């Protein structure tokens, strides 16, 4: 009888422990789901701020999102856009690199190339040629020498009165393209005038 009582007591203790384990697993699962929901809400909020061009608020929301869910790839992309909008170009690239290192999501690796292109376009549109030149050089590293990036880079050098580099860039581009020929002629004339003055 005593053995039977010990066996029953042991069974009750084991069943109680199993119930506690299931409860703790449920608590962890619920916490993860709540964290995921909160991260999704922060992502949506940050994306909305990007759309409204409130980049500082977007950066704040998206950083919190990534803190809650470091594997949330889309948040890294939106955060990069917010950094570009806030004219924090190096941070835009850095966050994509960190996101790729953390998640190994190839879309983040590809987005780094798009980020360079976007930064180049923003800087040339804003006529910030001094800042644009290093980014345009990175773009040529990514895409190779193309008519478009050669014209952009030559324009940036010309606007900085660096006609020698403008001519050099255009000489490396496709000489059969009419726009390159025209730009090269203009750059040579401007360089000659610059040297003469």
Task: Locate each region found by the language model.
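Canonical tetratricopeptide repeat
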Residues: 44, 78, 111-118, 152, ...
